[in-house]
Amino acid sequence: MRNVRRVAVGATPSGFMGSRRKAALGAPVLNLMCGTALVAGLTFCVQDAWAQDWVPELQAATGETHGRNDPIVIILPDDLDPAVYPRLAVELDDIDVTAFAVTAPGQLTLNPPEALSTGEHVVRLVERGEDGSIVERGAWFLEVRHSELIRDLSVRADLAGEVNARVLDGGIDTPPQHVTAESGGNLEAAAGDENWRVSLQGNYLYNSQLELGLNERNIDLGEYRLDGDYENEDFFAGLTAGNHDTGIESLIMSGFNRRGVSVRAGTADERISATGFMLRTESIVGTRHVLGISHDEDRIEGGSISVRPIEALKDNILLTGIYYNGEGSDGGFGIGTDEVINDGDGWSVAADTLWFDEALRVRGEFAEATFDFDGKDTGFAPETANAYSVLASLEPLRGSTLGGSTFNWTFGAQREQVDTFFQSLANPSLQADRETTSVFTDFFWDEFAAQLRVDHQLSNVDDFDFLPTDRTVNAYFNGTYTPFVEPLEDGSLPWFGQPFFGLTASVTDIERVETSSDFPEDDADNQSRSLTLSTGSNYATWSWNLSHTLYTFEDQTGFSSDSINNTTGLSAYILIDDWLTLSPNVQYDVFEDRDLLKTSRTINAGLSADITVIPETLTASLNYNLNVRTGDGDTPDSSSFGGEVVWTLREPDANKLGVALAFNGFLQETRNDDFESLEDDVQYQAFTTLRLSLPVSY
């Protein structure tokens, strides 16, 4: 074991701003750092005879701050023996970077191979002894900043565009322009310091064909999001503008990603937090409504507050209240025109609790919503309805292991009731008029995973005579098994590879418990069942996957035909060589109408190939698809062939434009011998393309 001697460092390193650290690391910090790549695992001993006591210093930054690309200069004593220089090594963030250091009389200059990230870095200088021992001469914290005001600054963008020239076509309607262009890109920018951060995300779309452009414009903004956050030891605050989801999840507001503005604030320990929002009701993109909240008739506003009332149980009990009101035209009952404006409001209160080391979760929520279905200030009065949800889940063996592997098992129950006329502008996808009781369990252990859920649902919650009452029972199961396979002595897999197995099954039973007074003859009694079996295996250079799905539908009322559907699919991925990969697939489908005694069969087959002619320069991709239908209700067969050849003139790299030329096209043939069709049997197109791409990074 080599010996290491640690020399006391008494120098004062420079290069830190304001009240940043101004001294070399003392003994406690050095003890913390000693587990690095150069020092870890080595023992300490008394001072070696070859080692001299000398102290280096870190040179101050030449400007106001130490920039990302600035060299790191370590000042060496003037009287240091030049024979020591070859024995010096530099470490940056636990990585030996001596190869990038240059020594000169009185100093050592490190030029990092790439720009340093902003933030705090650790620089360490060590001296190697002839006997293999190591002396740590100095260690410093170095803060890298963009400027005195901004510590972190980054800009990233992925820009891509292409110009297409149609050189060949037939049997298909084509636009008059033979040369078209399109482009798209994503942008991310961020700036911040220790307590604050501002970030921007956005994208754009361009199309030379006006009719295909976003909002009938050649170029326009897609979606964007602007965030600003501040946090200190006592509180946090933030603002978001653009397309975003406030993160509020409740019966009256869920998954509501819209354009608008929201603010948030709370205590640093998150015992109290609040969110206020003003969002557009409909989803929009583009620059026509930049903030999205300019129209009163298409906007909701409100807020939420969350409290952890008991300090001793602040991680266990969370109380949340939400309120909103507004107007919009997507109420969810087929109302989607500008002429009909629905208004509504709603509120909810919820309690979410965790017990027994978070093994038991109990959550309850009650909500009330008012909604004017036939339009604001017209027709009938608004409807007010309620909804509630109760959830309990238990993970009895939380954190346990079985056979040396993590074992997770969760089971629970949920009760949810949503009144017949419950409707929220901020949660338009919520299914109303249902009373649902569910039980579920999730299981994961080593090679096994399974999920099981059973739902019992009743409709016509408010017992209206003019509505029927239906009972729906749904059961769902999904399970996977991936056994561990020990590689052979040569590192390869056995003949059966790395197999995997899966099973998915579902059953849905719908029964009409009580008919409506308006349509007493209408009945409902049907069952649908689905079973999917899948298996496959992975090898070093290829893989395969086989699946079969059986679906049956039975209608006891005779309103719909009983049917059976069998679908079998087989696919593979084969790496023939470094220059060729093949992806074949075939699917066989049989559909039987048991009432009409008709059967139809469909075969879909395909083959894709990726070819590398010259690595990173010339590539090609080809694909062939065949669709054959037989039996009752026979329809035309079709086949298609497509492909592309790409010649890369210059690979895209950070802040460097990538250029490529491509030739692509397709040919489709439809066999219409027994059918009359307005379209040609053979359709084809071919293009030459110039592609440009530019990844930007700063």
Regions found by a protein language model. Name each.
Residues 80-88:
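Solvent-exposed loop/turn segments flanking beta-strands in beta-repeat/beta-sandwich domains
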Residues 113-120:
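Surface-exposed, short loops/turns at beta-strand junctions within beta-sandwich domains
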Residues 1-26:
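N-terminal secretory signal peptides that target proteins for export/translocation
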